[in-house]
C-alpha cells in the first residue's frame, strides 16, 4: 500500500467517539482561503518521477479553517476554529434535544398525573407534543456530529420508520399515539424504531462525553418499551420507569447547554476531509506532506 493510500485509509478508521480537542493559544494568521493559486503535484508510489505531473488546485490552504484572532484546535487533518455557522448548528441541535425532552414530559404527564388533571388538557396536547418531539429528534439526527456516517444514516432510517408507524396509528385510529400505545402494547412495534433512534443518540452522547444520564437512558428507554410490550412490567413499574425516563431526558437536555461548542463538534477536520472529493483529498495530503510533515507522519503511522 502506498503512503498516500495508507493516509487515506487511516481517515476511514477514525473511531466515532468524539474527543474534545484542546484549545491552542490564539494566533494571527492570514485570511482563510479556500484554495491557493498554487499547483500541487500528486504522484502515486513508484510513479516515474520524470513523467509529466498530474496536478490539482483543488486543495484548500493548510490554514484555511483557522479563523484569524480566534482559538484554534489541532485536528487529525488540519487545525480548525469554531465559526459562527458551527455555533448556530450546535445550538440548534441542543434546542432540538430540548424539544424532545419537553415532548416526552408532555406525553407522559397523563400517566404520571392522571388523565383528568387540568381538565383533560394534558390528554389533548399529547398528539401535537408527540409529533413535535418526533420532528425535534429528526432535526437533531440531521445536526448531530458523528464520524461514522453509515451509523448516522441508520439512525435516521430508524427514525423515519418510527415516524411512519406513528403516522399510521394516528391516521388509522384518530387517537393520540401515546394514548393508543399505552392501551395497545403491540403498537410498540410500530413506534419502536423512533425510540431506538433516540436511544442511539443517548448512546453516542454517553460514550463521547461520559454522561451518566445518557448511559442510564440507553437502558431505561428499551426496558420501558419492552416491559410494556411483553407485559412483564406491572403498571407501577411502568410508571416508575417512565418517571425516571422523563427525569433523565430533562437532565440530558439541560446539561447540553453547559458544554463548550467545540466539544459538540469533535474533530472538525475529519468532517472537512470526508466532504472532499478524491482529487481534493490527494492534493490535500500532498500539500500536508510538503507543508506539515509532522502531521503527515502521524497520519501515515495510523495505518501501521
Residue ranges and their predicted role:
Residues 1-37, 44-47:
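N-terminal chloroplast transit peptides
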Residues 28-192, 200-203, 225-304:
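N-terminal organelle-targeting presequences
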Residues 207-214, 230-232:
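Transmembrane helical hairpin unit
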Residues 212-223, 245:
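Central hydrophobic cores of alpha-helical transmembrane segments
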